[in-house]
């Protein structure tokens, strides 16, 4: 992965803590979760099922009877990281079960690590459980093995990823996710809302809505209507977002939307984000990938970059405080210097708030591998540096304009010196910036939503004082 990762990286988040110590003679398992938040949610579901069957969860290799490695296979660099993690687990523990996206290539994994116990593909929960049962038989004690209503969480207690669908119907040439995770399969709206309600009741202050294609949610279900409370809710991203934003008052809950593909109906979400009574944040994580129409066509992406600028202007007219985050690929096969300069010029016009970028690399099975005119590595690096220099300048100017403003922030961490690491509504965990409070934090707790006045700005971060 690059130093500015294109995806959320929950594996970089603080290490989770698990309830109580295992009871005597309780079988225990370890979990290594790599890749994106969708994989993290899969890990949480696997661990929740295993906890319900009486397994304990070990935070280290030594205390585990076996280790599950949930892999990533999106990029070749991610595959290498997954193989390294499998090797480490084998060395430190010896009993290893592999699952996740790289699990779709069992022969490839066994070629490198023939001693693994089993391999399963992504979101194949039952097969993972079968492999665990074979390696470490369960030993449940229903009077002792208590499980929280929200299941096992691998994130800090005040925020949680909420997966609303699996798979993707797009055929972007650089991506193999549809091959690994299949076509779009949306969860029923009432099932998503029930899970979200449990999380909020348990004290979660921020719901991060994720999927492979959030704005396509419900398309495969023909936007069916589901019963919810005293009424109904449609399986459509606008209706679902509105209902999520009504689970708690807007000063007590944040709902953040990620992976929002730039469909025309995204504009329906913007008035919701501008509504101060709804908890849906004015924040869109929307993967543009590039701006030049010819590059977008070679990617098999929507190629109307000029219309995208019009959409951005329309969004900001309705919701001036909206934060736009996006990711881009530089050095895509065939990308010329003129096409790259077009992207830089587009960035000047779009003025995106948060930007990630990564250099193109081949991925086994991706159609882009066979495109002509691959870009030299030194050219990719040069373009990445120039792109990030542009993005940094835009970020620095935008953050400087926030000095003197009063903002609501969520507290993520308080260190031993009393310095609080927080985030504004414009900042998603791990991938965006932070706001730091240096003093007066004695009465703060992780997860608090508080008001601060911004008194200093940097390239990506802010500093402020409680108000």
UniProtKB/Swiss-Prot annotation:
**Which keywords has UniProt assigned to this entry?**
4Fe-4S, Cytoplasm, Iron, Iron-sulfur, Metal-binding, S-adenosyl-L-methionine, Transferase
Q: What HAMAP family does the record point to?
A: MTTase_RimO (MF_01865)
Note down the stretches annotated as region Disordered: 1-27
Pfam families in UniProt = Radical_SAM (PF04055), TRAM_2 (PF18693), UPF0004 (PF00919)
Q: Which cofactor does it need?
A: [4Fe-4S] cluster
Q: Which Gene3D superfamilies match?
A: Methylthiotransferase, N-terminal domain, Nucleic acid-binding proteins, tm_1862 like domain
Q: Which PANTHER family match?
A: RIBOSOMAL PROTEIN S12 METHYLTHIOTRANSFERASE RIMO (PTHR43837), RIBOSOMAL PROTEIN US12 METHYLTHIOTRANSFERASE RIMO (PTHR43837:SF1)
- Kindly list the positions annotated as binding [4Fe-4S] cluster 1: 36, 72, 101
Intracellular or extracellular location(s) = Cytoplasm
PROSITE patterns assigned to the protein according to its UniProt record, in alphabetical order: MTTASE_N, RADICAL_SAM, TRAM
* Sequence positions that bind [4Fe-4S] cluster 2: 168, 172, 175
Annotated organism of origin: Ruegeria sp. (strain TM1040)
Provide one Gene Ontology biological process annotation: tRNA modification
Q: Which GO terms describe its molecular function?
A: 4 iron, 4 sulfur cluster binding; aspartic acid methylthiotransferase activity; metal ion binding; protein methylthiotransferase activity
Full protein name: Ribosomal protein uS12 methylthiotransferase RimO
InterPro entries to which the protein is assigned, alphabetical: Elp3/MiaA/NifB-like_rSAM, Methylthiotransferase, Methylthiotransferase_N, Methylthiotransferase_N_sf, NA-bd_OB-fold, Ribosomal_uS12_MeSTrfase_RimO, rSAM, rSAM_horseshoe
So what does this one do?
Answer: Catalyzes the methylthiolation of an aspartic acid residue of ribosomal protein uS12.
As recorded in UniProt, coiled-coil segments are none
What top-level class of enzyme does the UniProt entry assign?
A: transferase
**Catalytic function, reaction form:** L-aspartate(89)-[ribosomal protein uS12]-hydrogen + (sulfur carrier)-SH + AH2 + 2 S-adenosyl-L-methionine = 3-methylsulfanyl-L-aspartate(89)-[ribosomal protein uS12]-hydrogen + (sulfur carrier)-H + 5'-deoxyadenosine + L-methionine + A + S-adenosyl-L-homocysteine + 2 H(+)
Superkingdom of this protein's organism: Bacteria
- The residues covered by the MTTase N-terminal domain are 27-137
What Enzyme Commission number(s) does the record list for this chain? 2.8.4.4
What residue stretches are annotated with the TRAM domain?
A: 400-467
Q: How is the cofactor bound, as the UniProt entry phrases it?
A: Binds 2 [4Fe-4S] clusters. One cluster is coordinated with 3 cysteines and an exchangeable S-adenosyl-L-methionine.
Domain (Radical SAM core): give its ranges.
154-397
């Amino acid at each position: 992965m690059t130093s500015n990762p294109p995806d959320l990286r929950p594996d970089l988040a603080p290490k989770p803590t698990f309830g109580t110590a295992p009871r005597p003679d309780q079988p225990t398992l370890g979990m290594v979760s790599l890749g994106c938040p969708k994989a993290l949610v899969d890990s949480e579901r696997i661990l929740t099922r295993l906890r319900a069957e009486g397994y304990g969860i070990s935070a280290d290799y030594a205390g585990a009877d076996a280790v599950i490695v949930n892999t990533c296979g999106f990029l070749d660099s991610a595959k290498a990281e997954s193989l390294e993690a499998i090797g480490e687990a084998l060395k430190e523990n010896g009993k290893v079960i592999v699952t996740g996206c790289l699990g779709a290539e069992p022969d490839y994994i066994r070629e490198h690590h023939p001693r693994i116990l089993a391999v399963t593909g992504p979101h194949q929960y039952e097969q993972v459980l079968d492999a665990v049962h074979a390696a470490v038989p369960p030993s449940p004690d229903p009077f002792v093995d208590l499980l929280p209503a929200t299941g096992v969480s691998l994130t800090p207690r005040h925020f949680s990823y909420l997966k609303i669908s699996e798979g993707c119907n797009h055929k972007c040439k650089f991506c193999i996710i549809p091959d690994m995770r299949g076509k779009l399969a949306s969860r029923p709206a009432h099932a998503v809302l029930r899970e979200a309600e449990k999380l909020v009741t348990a004290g979660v202050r921020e719901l991060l809505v994720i999927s492979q294609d959030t704005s396509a949610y419900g398309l495969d279900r023909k936007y069916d209507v589901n019963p919810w409370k005293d009424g109904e809710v449609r399986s459509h991203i606008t209706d679902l977002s509105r209902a999520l934003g009504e689970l708690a008052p807007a000063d007590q809950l944040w709902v953040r939307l990620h992976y929002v593909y730039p469909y025309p109906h995204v504009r329906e979400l913007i008035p919701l984000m501008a509504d101060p009574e709804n908890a849906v944040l004015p924040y869109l994580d929307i993967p543009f990938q590039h701006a030049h129409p010819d590059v977008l066509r070679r990617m098999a992406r929507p190629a109307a970059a000029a219309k995208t600028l019009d959409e951005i202007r329309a969004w900001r007219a309705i919701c001036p405080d909206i934060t736009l985050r996006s990711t881009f690929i530089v050095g895509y096969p065939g990308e010329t210097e003129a096409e790259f300069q077009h992207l830089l010029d587009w960035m000047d016009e779009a003025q995106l708030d948060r930007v990630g970028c990564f250099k193109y690399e081949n991925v086994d099975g991706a159609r882009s591998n066979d495109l002509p005119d691959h870009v030299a590595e030194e050219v990719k690096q040069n373009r990445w540096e120039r792109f990030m220099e542009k993005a940094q300048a835009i970020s620095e100017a935008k953050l400087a304009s926030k000095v003197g403003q009063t903002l609501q922030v969520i507290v993520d961490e308080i260190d031993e010196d009393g310095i609080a690491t927080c985030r504004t509504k414009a900042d998603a965990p791990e991938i965006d910036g932070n706001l730091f409070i240096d003093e007066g934090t004695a009465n703060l707790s992780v997860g608090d939503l508080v008001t601060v006045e911004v008194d200093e700005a940097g390239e990506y971060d802010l500093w402020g004082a409680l108000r």
